[in-house]
Design a protein with these regions (language model features):
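Short glycine-enriched, charge-decorated loop/helix-capping segments at active-site entrances
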Residues: 1-7, 54-57, 131
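Glycine-rich FAD cofactor-binding loop and adjacent beta-loop-alpha segment at the N-terminus
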Residues: 1-33
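A general structural signal for well-ordered alpha-helical segments in protein cores
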Residues: 9-13, 69, 139, 143
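Pocket-edge structural micro-motifs
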Residues: 10, 40, 51, 146, ...
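Conserved FAD-binding catalytic core of PHBH/FMO-like flavoproteins
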Residues: 16, 117-166
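Residue-level detector of short coil/turn "hinge" positions at structural boundaries
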Residues: 23-24, 83, 132
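Conserved N-terminal helical subregion
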Residues: 29-127, 135-139
Length: 166
């Protein structure tokens, strides 16, 4: 199972609302949180974010990765997005008039713009000749959304950054 979650701030929620997907996410499973305390297990400074400081009822919401993806995919057809799935880009041509893509199933697509949002090892990015620099920061985070409720402090999330290299 995919256990990843996102902590969405108010601006993120506004964007998802404008896209028309927030009501479906909130109705399914979005957990509000009022505080977020981040600490570094290696002894760095703690960070504390509190909704009261910003005059808000909640600081944001915790949303599961799978739920977010499901609701975003479901919203694409209503937004006029044409899906070409499953398919992979095999060739890219670009000039002043736009871009042309050839897919592995033989289809050809033309557009004013192609966005390389196909992952860390983006074929489209590579075909366009866009280089990247990669860095592994050797950091992971652990989020315990229930810790705040157990401690009697209300809805709080407590991410912990383990010591470097773990």
């Amino acid at each position: 199972p995919d256990l990843r979650v996102f902590a969405f701030a108010a601006d993120n929620v506004q964007l998802l609302s404008r896209l028309g997907v927030w009501p479906a996410i909130a109705q399914a499973r979005a957990w509000p949180y009022r505080r977020m305390q981040v600490w570094d297990a290696a002894g760095g400074e703690d960070l504390l974010f509190d909704a009261d400081r910003f005059g808000r009822r909640e600081l944001g919401y915790i949303v599961e990765n799978g739920l977010l993806q499901d609701r975003l995919w479901a919203a694409l057809p209503a937004a006029g997005v044409q899906l070409h799935c499953p398919a992979r880009v095999e060739a890219l041509e670009q000039d002043d008039d736009g871009v042309r893509l050839r897919l592995d199933d033989g289809r050809r697509l033309e557009a004013a713009l192609a966005v390389a949002a196909d992952g860390a090892e983006s074929t489209l990015r590579q075909l366009a000749g866009i280089e990247v620099e990669k860095h592994d920061y050797h950091q992971r985070g652990v989020v315990d959304p229930a810790a705040g409720e157990r401690a009697g402090v209300g809805k709080e999330i407590l991410p912990r950054i383990p010591p470097r290299g773990r």
